[in-house]
Structures are given as structure tokens and as C-alpha cells.
Amino acid sequence: MANIGLAFVNPAPLTKPAYVVNFAKKCEAMGVHSMWTIDRVAYDNLDSMILLAAAAGATQRIRIGTSVLLPGLRHPALLAKTIATLDFVSNGRVTIGVGFGSRENDFTAVEIPFDGRGSRAVECVQLMKRLWSEDNVTHKGRFYNVQNLTIGPRPIQKQIPIFTGGSAEAALKRAGTWANGFICGSSAIPEFSVTWEKVARYVRAAGRNPNEIEKAGLTFMAINDDHAKALEALNAYVVRYYGRQRGDVAATSLVGSPAAVAERIEAFLSRGLDTLIIGLADPD
């Protein structure tokens, strides 16, 4: 049976302090599988790790995760400790979706080069995996160097699930080679089976089992019986977040009346997804 996850994507000016905890509690009460959030620097979203820590404290069951975290913006030793702590206080409920970053201003803000961000993120993730499971880690890489480093706490989960996504061939290969899950963007959900077969080939080439890789999709939702108002809310969110309109986003999102949205959710899940992550574009 497929899972539904809900993503808290409100920018700070459009939310209130109580919303985060209330959102998490409602997710758990509704039987939702997971709660997710975004990760940016040069944008007025709430910090992803702190937001998820608040959600963890307000819940007992739901998984909490990022879709997606930008690991290349942080040193892997500090990020590994932060994520391990989040996994510890949530009693092993963390999933980390990682991305490589498409907005240069996020990198400029923390004085990290935009070029090489994909390789930097991959090296960060690989080093974090070692820091979560090994003592006295020594690593000499292109971007990071550590010497005899041991950090704590250890995560509750023996292996924190790491998801990645993308549509370029290199991104599909990364997902198939080392990720625990693949996140498909909304525009690619209608043809997910085609994309997944490409990922599965890389999974098999790496000596792994495609059935052990979780298949997730990310989309956005705006519900209103007045379709025009729902579409207005969706477009407003997209422009605010991406800085521009992105084609016919409504064609690959969940927009309209509750009945229309429910029908679209079923259609998306029929593409073979294990988890559908839904970002709520309407701040209400």
C-alpha cells in the first residue's frame, strides 16, 4: 500500500509559531505516513532541522524528512551530528532527501562555490555515512578533510535512509548507485515508470536490489472548490519559491476541489510510487 507524506513548505511570513507543531500533530492524527520540509538559505523558510526537531517532539509515529536538504551548504561533520541528533530525539524516524542546489544565491550566502556542488554534496553524504557508523574516521577528499574524527551520538537507525532525485542521467545514476530512495519531481510523475526503469538499471549494475529502493514522488497541492482560486494559490507559491512561473505547473500538481484532488492522488499513486509527498501550496 502506498504512503502519503505531507510537506510543510510555508515561508515564515505566512505562518505562525504554533503552525509547525499543529501541522505535525494533525499529520499523526490523520494517519499520514510522514512529514517533510524544504531546505534553503536565501529564502524565508524555517530551518529544516529545527522545524523537524519540533515536529519530532510533538509526535510519536510519523517519519520526518527533508525533500530536499542541501548537504553541500554545510560541513559534513556538523551536519552528520545534527542529523544523528535528530534521529536520536525522534527515536529513529528520520529520512533525508538530498539535493544539489539549483539556486546560486543559497551558495553565495554561505561563501561556498556554486560550481562543483554535485560532487561536493556526494562527498558530504559519503563522509556522513562513515561518521555515523565508524570511529576515528580519516578522510582526504576534494572538498573535505578530517583526521581521526569520531562524533556522537550514533543514529538510532543503523542506516539513516538517504533519498535523492533529479532527471539528468548523472542524477539517475547517483540514485541507483548509493541512495536508499529516489524522489521524482511532479513534472516527471506521469512518466515515472520510464524514469524508474533507468534508475533500476543503475541499481542492478551496482549489485543492489531495486525492490529495496523506495520510490517517492513530490508534488504540490491547493484545494478549493473554486478551481481558479486553487490555481491562484498554487501559482503564487511557485513564483514565491522558485522566483518564476514554471510552465504549466497545474498539469502536474493537485489542484481544485477535494474530489478532484483525491482522484488525481489515486492517478499519481498508480504510477508505481511507494510514497507521494504533497507540499501544501496554500498557507492556510
Regions found by a protein language model. Give the residues of each.
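Active-site-adjacent structural elements that line small-molecule/cofactor binding pockets in enzymes
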Residues: 1-284
